Amino acid sequence: MTALPTDFLYSEEHEWVNTSAVVEGETVRVGITHIAAEALGDIVFVELPEVGSEVEAGEAFGEVESTKSVSDIYAPVSGEVVAVNEALEDNAGLINEDPYGEGWLYEVKVTEAGELMEAEAYQAANE
């Protein structure tokens, strides 16, 4: 079983940001948790936002498709997308293999934090 990184923050919709304190103007990396990845099953495709586009906390920005279903992915913070993980185009399964590392989705320059929780609270909400 994959452990939640304790220095990340999490959304109720199972996304993470790679910081313990979201600061306006800071760039953070975003992904989905192992809990979401395990629930989805084998991920075969992911739709990511365009670089330069704006995402809004709590709003859907793309989809993840698995052998079981298609699900929306929600932005945990608002801001401008500055990079996307192009490796996912050829191997969306990286999300299953390494959700907190090589399976990241995009990087965003934060304009506003969404409602995020620490690892302990996220874990408790998903037991």
Curated annotation (Swiss-Prot):
PROSITE patterns cross-referenced by the UniProt entry: BIOTINYL_LIPOYL, LIPOYL
Modification N6-lipoyllysine, positions: K68
Statement: the UniProt record of this protein carries the keyword Repressor: no
Domain Lipoyl-binding span(s) in chain numbering: 27-109
Key words of the record: Lipoyl
Gene Ontology CC entries for this record: cytosol; glycine cleavage complex
Cofactors demanded by this protein: (R)-lipoate
GO biological process: glycine decarboxylation via glycine cleavage system
Taxonomic superkingdom: Bacteria
PANTHER family, alphabetized: GLYCINE CLEAVAGE SYSTEM H PROTEIN, GLYCINE CLEAVAGE SYSTEM H PROTEIN-RELATED
Subunit details: The glycine cleavage system is composed of four proteins: P, T, L and H.
Purpose of the protein: The glycine cleavage system catalyzes the degradation of glycine. The H protein shuttles the methylamine group of glycine from the P protein to the T protein.
Family note: Belongs to the GcvH family.
Protein name: Glycine cleavage system H protein
Biological source species: Corynebacterium jeikeium (strain K411)
Gene: gcvH
